UniProtKB/Swiss-Prot annotation:
Residues in the Lumenal compartment per record: 24-375
A molecular function (GO) term: alpha-1,2-galactosyltransferase activity
Transmembrane segments annotated in the record for this chain: 3-23
Name of the protein: Uncharacterized alpha-1,2-galactosyltransferase C1289.13c
GO cellular component, as recorded: endoplasmic reticulum; endoplasmic reticulum membrane; Golgi apparatus; Golgi membrane
Swiss-Prot/TrEMBL keywords: Endoplasmic reticulum, Glycosyltransferase, Golgi apparatus, Membrane, Signal-anchor, Transferase, Transmembrane, Transmembrane helix
Major location category of this protein: endoplasmic reticulum
The protein's Enzyme Commission number: 2.4.1.-
Protein topology in the membrane: Single-pass type II membrane protein
Location in the cell: Endoplasmic reticulum membrane; Golgi apparatus membrane
InterPro entries from the UniProt entry: Glyco_trans_34, Nucleotide-diphossugar_trans
Assigned protein family: Belongs to the glycosyltransferase 34 family.
Length: 375
C-alpha cells in the first residue's frame, strides 16, 4: 500500500494548484470592485454618471497655466472620446501649453550606493552625476532618493514598487512641478543637449510622438490581443507617458503629470491587490492591467516610441540606442549580468563626446581604468 503515502501530498498539491487558478481568475473581478470603490471615493476627479454602456464624467485638467480648466468628455466601452471644449480651453489653445523647465523633476532611486555587491556600485555616483548635470543644464529639478529608506513602505514586495511612494514624495516636495520623469538607475542620459521639454513635452511635439491606434504588446499573460491605443488622443489629455517593448510597457523610463488625474493614477497603481498578485514583471504588470481593463486609464496614457525616452542596448532599430537618442536603459542587465559591461560601453561613448569631467571624482580613477585600460 505504498501508493497510500502519496495520496495526501497529491491532494495538497491539487488544492494549491486549484487555488492559484482561482486567484488569477478572480483577480479581475476583485480589482474591478476595488476600482469602483476607488472611483466613488474620488468623485471630485472623475464625476461619473452611468447610463447603459456610456460613462459621462467631468475631469479637471492641470495645465502649466495657473488655472484649472474643466473639460467634459464622453467615454464609451470602446473608449471613443468626444470632447466638449469650453470657451476658456478655446482661448488657451492659442497659447503654447508646455511646462516651464523649472517645473520638471528628474527622479532617480537606488540603493546600489549602499551595496558593494551591486554591479552598479562602482559607477552609481557617476550615474547620479550624469542625471544631476543634465537637470542643471536645462533648469530642471533633480532628486535622488535612497531605496533603502523606502523599504518599510513596500514591506516584503520587490524593490520596483518603491518608485510609487518616491514619486508621491517628490510631488509633495515640489507641488508646483508639472511633470516628474522617472528614470531607473540602470540607465544613462546620452544626449545632454536634448531638452526634455522640446523633445517630448511641448504640445506640438507630443502630438507628433503619440502612437495612436497602435497595438499594445503584452508578455505579461494579460489577454491584450487586438487591444490598441486610442485613435483620437489629445496631448492635453495625456497624464502618463511611457513606451513598450516586446514584453509590453516598460516602466524603466516614464513621465507622469502632477495633476489630479496623475496623482489618482499613482494611487490606483499602488492598490494593495496588485502587490498581492505580484507577477513576474511586478509594477509593470499592474500598470498593464490598469491600461487594458479601465477606459479612464487607457485614455490618459500616452504611448511613445521606445527610443524617444527609453532606448535599449539592442541591435533592433526600433528599440536599440542610436547616436543622438536621449538616454539608454540597460533593461534586464541584472538578470543577464551585463550592467557593468553596458555602463562601460556607453560610458565610453559619453567620454568621447564630453571628456572626463562627467565622472564623479570618487569614481573617476576606477572608471578611467575600466574604460581606457593601459597596456
Amino acid at each position: 500500500m505504498r501508493w497510500y503515502s502519496y495520496v495526501i501530498p497529491a491532494v495538497i498539491l491539487s488544492i494549491i494548484a486549484i487555488s492559484g487558478v482561482w486567484w488569477n481568475a478572480t483577480l479581475g473581478t476583485r480589482l474591478d470592485q476595488k476600482v469602483q470603490l476607488f472611483l466613488n471615493e474620488h468623485s471630485s476627479i472623475l464625476n461619473a454618471v452611468y447610463e447603459t454602456t456610456t460613462i459621462v464624467y467631468t475631469e479637471p485638467l492641470h495645465t502649466s497655466v495657473s488655472e484649472t480648466i474643466t473639460s467634459t468628455s464622453f467615454v464609451t466601452e470602446t473608449t471613443t472620446v468626444t470632447p466638449t471644449v469650453t470657451a476658456t480651453a478655446q482661448e488657451l489653445s492659442t497659447l503654447n501649453p508646455h511646462p516651464e523647465n523649472s517645473k520638471i523633476v528628474l527622479l532617480m532611486g537606488s540603493n546600489a550606493q549602499n551595496d558593494p555587491s551591486s554591479p552598479l556600485n562602482p559607477y552609481i555616483r557617476t550615474i547620479i552625476k550624469n542625471r544631476r548635470d543634465y537637470a542643471e543644464r536645462h533648469g530642471f529639478k533633480f532628486e535622488f532618493l535612497d531605496l533603502d529608506e523606502y523599504k518599510p513602505s513596500i514591506g516584503d514586495k520587490p524593490a520596483p514598487w518603491a518608485k510609487i511612494p518616491m514619486i508621491k514624495n517628490v510631488i509633495r516636495k515640489y507641488p508646483d512641478a508639472e511633470w516628474v520623469w522617472w528614470l531607473d538607475h540602470d540607465a544613462l542620459i546620452m544626449n545632454r543637449d536634448l531638452n526634455l521639454v522640446d523633445h517630448i513635452l511641448k504640445h506640438e511635439k507630443l502630438n507628433s510622438l503619440l502612437l495612436r491606434d497602435t497595438e499594445y504588446f503584452s508578455g505579461f499573460g494579460i489577454d491584450s490581443e487586438g487591444f490598441r491605443t486610442p485613435k483620437n488622443q489629445d496631448p492635453d489629455d495625456i497624464h502618463f507617458i511611457i513606451a513598450q517593448d516586446f514584453n509590453g510597457i516598460n516602466a524603466g523610463s516614464f513621465l507622469i503629470r502632477n495633476s489630479e488625474v496623475g496623482t489618482w493614477m499613482l494611487d490606483f497603481w499602488n492598490e494593495p491587490l496588485y502587490k498581492e498578485h505580484n507577477g513576474v514583471f511586478v509594477e509593470q504588470q499592474a500598470l498593464s492591467h490598469m491600461i487594458y481593463s479601465h477606459p479612464i486609464v487607457h485614455k490618459h496614457v500616452g504611448l511613445v516610441t521606445l527610443r524617444s525616452i527609453n532606448a535599449y542596448d539592442s541591435s533592433d532599430p526600433a528599440w536599440g540606442y542610436e547616436d543622438g537618442d536621449l538616454c539608454v536603459h540597460f533593461a534586464g542587465c541584472f538578470v543577464f549580468q551585463t550592467c557593468a559591461q553596458n555602463f562601460e560601453k556607453y560610458g565610453k561613448i559619453i567620454t568621447e563626446k564630453q571628456g572626463h569631467d562627467w565622472f564623479d571624482p570618487s569614481e573617476k580613477e576606477y572608471i578611467e581604468q575600466r574604460l581606457f585600460p593601459q597596456p
